């Protein structure tokens, strides 16, 4: 009962307030869609719940400026439609203000939207958020840089870098470019040599991949994506692959796709409120929510418990329109 009361206390009614909506016109789900009809459908969904809506559909180069303008306006709720990169930008900008963020799943992966149980069908997503509720969720950060999903070190930053180079050079789509980059990288699998400390003293690990997630992942058989059932546990998920060869890593990747990764004895998992990664290198590369970064070690990871107010579909079974209070 105490847990239920705490959860209720962290939730508030949703729309029915001044709302700014920014759409990335080039986001995957909008390609080939009549943008005027999409804009009208979003506006109507929120205005039916009493929201005062200002909506902009902008090109990718203008997204950051549009998000900043929305945050600096008198809007209480800022809704962003785009991929994980667009969402990552919005979170870093909105977090210091205490304003509410809403996410429309318009990208390829839509990881946070999935974990918030937001429908991926656009019409359903509009309605679910328009009648939604405000929740407080955790964010993770490393050396002051905020992320919502995961921070990945090891071979993966090299894969992402190769993928982007191939997309630019050969004009490949994202997934074919990713496949080619993965094959090239894991043939000569690089190992990360670091010491990690989560409060029990530093321990050396040599691994092809180290993942630090914002809240732990849950084993979900048959799921091709890593999922989180909780976004407010106050814990980081830490995952260290013990495999040091290509075939072992491929086996782990296969189990991840099948949703059976938790049964891999060569994957070490733990949870912690904070984690420090030490290295002899001057810089370490990582991929945070799809963005490649370089940082000087030590890397200081921590969780910021319930630091972000976010609009999410209702979870209490309330009827449509219940979130529309003034």
Give the label of every model feature segment.
Residues 1-77, 88, 317, 326:
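ATP/NTP phosphate-donor binding region
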Residues 2-11, 198-200, 204, 230, ...:
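ATP/nucleoside-binding phosphotransfer catalytic cores, i.e., glycine-rich phosphate-binding loops
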Residues 26, 40-43, 48-49, 56-58, ...:
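Catalytic core of DAGKc-family lipid kinases
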Residues 80-85:
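N-terminal glycine-rich "phosphate-gripper" loop used for MgATP/nucleotide binding
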Residues 86-99:
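Short Gly/Thr/Asp-enriched flexible loops that form oxyanion-binding sites at enzyme active sites
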Residues 152, 211-227, 292:
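Glycine-rich phosphate/pyrophosphate-binding beta-alpha loops
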Residues 167-176, 218-220, 227-247:
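Gly/Ser/Thr-rich active-site loops/lids in small-molecule metabolic enzymes
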């Amino acid at each position: 009962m105490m847990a239920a009361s705490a959860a209720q206390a962290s939730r508030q009614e949703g729309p029915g307030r001044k709302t700014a909506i920014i759409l990335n016109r080039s986001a995957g789900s909008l390609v080939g869609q009549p943008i005027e009809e999409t804009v009208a459908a979003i506006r109507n969904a929120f205005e039916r719940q009493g929201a005062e809506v200002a909506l902009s559909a902008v090109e990718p180069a203008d997204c950051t400026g549009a998000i900043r303008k929305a945050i600096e306006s008198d809007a209480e709720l800022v809704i962003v439609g785009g991929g994980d990169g667009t969402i990552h930008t919005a979170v870093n900008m909105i977090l210091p203000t205490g304003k509410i963020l809403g996410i429309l799943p318009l990208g390829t992966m839509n990881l946070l939207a999935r974990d918030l149980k937001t429908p991926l069908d656009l019409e359903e997503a509009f309605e679910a958020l328009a009648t939604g509720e405000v929740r407080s969720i955790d964010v993770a950060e490393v050396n002051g840089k905020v992320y919502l999903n995961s921070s990945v070190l090891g071979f993966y930053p090299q894969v992402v870098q190769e993928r982007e180079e191939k997309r630019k050079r050969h004009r490949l789509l994202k997934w074919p470019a990713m496949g080619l980059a993965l094959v090239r990288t894991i043939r000569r699998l690089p190992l990360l040599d670091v010491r990690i400390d989560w409060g029990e003293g530093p321990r050396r690990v040599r691994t092809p991949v180290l993942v630090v997630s914002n809240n732990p992942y849950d084993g979900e058989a048959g799921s091709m994506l890593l999922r989180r059932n909780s976004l407010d546990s106050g814990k980081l998920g830490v995952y260290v692959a013990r495999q040091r060869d290509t075939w072992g890593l491929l086996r782990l990747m296969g189990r991840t796709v099948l949703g059976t990764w938790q049964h891999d004895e060569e994957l070490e998992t733990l949870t912690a409120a904070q984690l420090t990664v030490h290295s002899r290198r001057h810089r370490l590369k990582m991929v945070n929510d799809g963005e490649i970064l370089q940082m000087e070690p030590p890397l200081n990871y921590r969780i910021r418990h319930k630091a972000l107010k976010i609009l999410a579909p209702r979870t209490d079974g309330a009827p449509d329109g219940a979130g529309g209070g003034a």
